[in-house]
A protein has these predicted regions:
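Noncatalytic, helix-rich "gating/capping" subdomain that lines the substrate-entry/channel surface
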Residues: 1-79, 83
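Zinc-dependent metallohydrolase catalytic domains
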Residues: 78-208, 217-376
Length: 376
């Protein structure tokens, strides 16, 4: 019992360290350095901005949207989402491994997707949340208690479909299987993911792949278990489900083979859902891009063909730098594959990528046509 008490006390201190005085903050950072390898602590203003977003993100979001998110960006994004939905339906119709019965169920689910773009239609009001200039720690306690009460108040009530799981400034996107919705906060609708004035190759290769990725989550190893209404229910024929699992096993083996650090490999099972999302998403985005005027042309821009610009735009999204310690931690805990493997994992299975860059037998990333995997 005494050991359990000590453990619980330690957890409280560890969870609260960032809200306490400097010695606690420094001790917490020193502990995290061992896991992440981070040499210098994130500047205080960035840490406070992140915490503010986490506590009152929709208040902060209103300011962010007013300053940085233009109406034309939302309109352009809605157009992209609609075009990718059309492309996805075409791809479902053309699948050679799925029966007509399961195809229809898949299309029903696709048609039922609810897209959310930029910011909520109804802003959270934070009524009853007490924030003062007297105590940072108490503010965070109050915020935690308020959030808990808000969640409990939703019990036994109809689902509020106006709520968002991310704040507007968030640079991310998500798919919710129980809501069957795809959500794109304003924060991700900027370079390198999106630019309203950019050519189609750039936008379809970047944010288009993200849109397709989130759509594909509705049909990955987890999302595929939910129907169009968000109910956990099997809608596959026995034969189609077996074929789907066989294909995902091949994708898992592909990522298992990637060596990240010494003997540490990517975990193909842990990252399965995200890898299915990447493979499906890039294919759907490319299908949609080829329906545009630029996608059907051969005109070069800055010396690159439309198809090359599409794939280069996808690649640029995954530029980054990560310390070995953080990379090792990611491999063991994160369902996302490291960026350097996400950037090659999907294209090596696409005939269009080989044609765009004239990839031939003997080249490092070459895969035989019969070994290139197509799921969605």
């Amino acid at each position: 019992v005494e050991t359990l008490k000590v453990y619980l006390k330690w957890n409280i201190l560890k969870g609260s360290a960032s809200y306490l005085s400097s010695p606690f903050v420094k001790a917490s950072f020193a502990y995290s350095q061992v896991l992440s390898g981070q040499k210098v602590q994130t500047p205080r203003w960035q840490r406070m901005s992140s915490l503010t977003d986490g506590v009152i993100g929709e208040l902060l979001g209103q300011l962010y949207v007013a300053r940085y998110f233009k109406p034309e960006a939302k309109e352009r994004m809605a157009e992209l989402v609609a075009n990718l939905r059309k492309a996805f339906e075409i791809r479902i119709n053309n699948l050679d491994w799925m029966s007509d019965a399961t195809k229809q169920k898949a299309k029903d689910k696709l048609h039922a997707f609810t897209p959310k773009i930029g910011y909520p239609d109804v802003w959270k009001k934070y009524e009853g949340l007490d924030i003062s200039a007297n105590s940072f720690y108490q503010n965070m306690r109050n915020a935690g208690a308020w959030s808990y009460k808000e969640n409990v108040a939703q019990l036994n009530k109809p689902i509020d479909r106006t709520k968002w799981g991310m704040t507007p400034p968030t640079v991310n996107a998500y798919y919710s299987p129980v809501m069957n919705e795809i959500v794109f906060p304003a924060g991700i609708l900027q370079f390198p993911f999106f630019a309203a004035e950019a050519d189609d190759a750039i936008n379809y290769g970047a944010i288009g792949a993200v849109i397709g990725h989130e759509m594909s989550h509705g049909f990955d190893d987890s999302g595929s278990q939910y129907d169009k209404d968000g109910t956990l229910r099997n809608w596959w024929t026995k034969e189609d489900l077996a074929k789907f699992k066989a294909k995902t096993a091949i994708l898992g083996a592909q990522f298992d083979a990637y060596i990240v650090l010494d003997t540490i490999h990517v975990n193909g099972k842990l990252t399965m859902g995200e890898n299915i999302g990447d493979l499906g998403g890039l294919n759907i985005a490319y299908e949609a891009f080829k329906m545009t005027k630029q996608g059907q042309s051969k005109k070069k821009i800055d010396g690159f063909t439309p198809d090359q610009r599409f794939f280069l735009s996808f690649a640029q999204v995954w530029r980054g730098s990560i310390l070995p310690e953080a990379l090792a931690q990611q491999i063991y805990t994160d369902p996302h594959s490291p960026g350097q493997y996400r950037v090659i994992g999907a294209p090596v299975n696409m005939d269009a990528w080989y044609k765009a860059f004239d990839i031939k037998p003997g080249d490092k990333l070459y895969k035989k046509p019969e070994d290139r995997l197509k799921i969605w």
